[in-house]
Amino acid sequence: MAAYAARYAPVPKQAGLKFSPEADVRFDIVERVAGSASTDFGVPGVVPALDLEPLQKREAERMATLVEACWTMFDRVVAGAPAELRKGPRGGGRDRDKIVDHVVGAEATAYAPRIGLRLSQPAFDDTKAITAHRAAIAEALRTGAHGKRTPEDRGWPARYAARRIGWHAIDHAWEMQDRSNPE
């Protein structure tokens, strides 16, 4: 995580939060969870017990603001990325519009239901619908409108949902950045 601090820095800056990527960072391990095959690819795929603890209003607001900052960063990268991205070493990889379609599709059809929302997938270029979907997701994270969702009912608690949704947008923003430049 510390090695990626500079890459994460635009997110808290966008959210209006203090963050110094140059500071000496010390991590305290507060919980260990078993990973899955997804973990090898960086997916935060396991809900830690700590995420099930009650969420205070101030923390919910902070998390929702960080998720919105992730979306803003994603949208900026999309706006600056070429339609056709450099292919991977085996010639694979989605181009920009397919990545956008994947991200907004996951938010609407995979992530939103996990926090109690029913959203249909918007077209990748329907900015009005995407904005409305994201506003609904952020509102659910802020207000706890999704209730006390747990892994047992296939739901996600707010902390995990915010981390997963934000990670997904940032991960694909970085993919587009990395593949926008010639090797």
Specify the residue positions occupied by each region the protein language model found:
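Transmembrane alpha-helical segments of integral membrane proteins
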Residues: 139-148
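Short secondary-structure boundary micro-motifs
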Residues: 48-50, 60-62, 148-149
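Short, contiguous alpha-helical
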Residues: 1-18, 64, 68, 72-131, ...
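A short small-residue
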Residues: 50-54, 118, 151
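Short hydrophobic/aromatic-rich motifs at helix boundaries and adjacent loops
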Residues: 43-48, 81-83, 111, 144
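A short, mixed-charge helix-start or loop-turn motif at secondary-structure junctions
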Residues: 56-60, 154-155
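Short, charged, surface-exposed hinge/linker loops at domain edges
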Residues: 6-57
